[in-house]
Amino acid sequence: KDLPYFYGKFKREEFLKFSNVISKVGLEIKDISSFYFFPSGRWDIKFKDGLLLKLPNTDLINVLSKALLLKNNQNFLNSKIIDLRIKNRIISNG
């Protein structure tokens, strides 16, 4: 009933791999409104609270683990975008 929307053209294997990473870091599907897949092989996640998380196409377990910490960090509570595509950089609009 509350399944997220999916945007972009991706192979089933690509999503299954990404889904495995999501479950490993403890991300709840019920908190996600949409997934966006890009031709470069990377994903964005839009949460139901309005936050857009821009992910790189490598090191996803590590990056998603850090992203969840940032999402709940006081300094990022007003952020609508957290961009983690550049290694060792956090870009936020909040």
What are these regions (language model features)?
Residues 1-94:
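Charged, solvent-exposed interaction patches on well-folded alpha/beta domains
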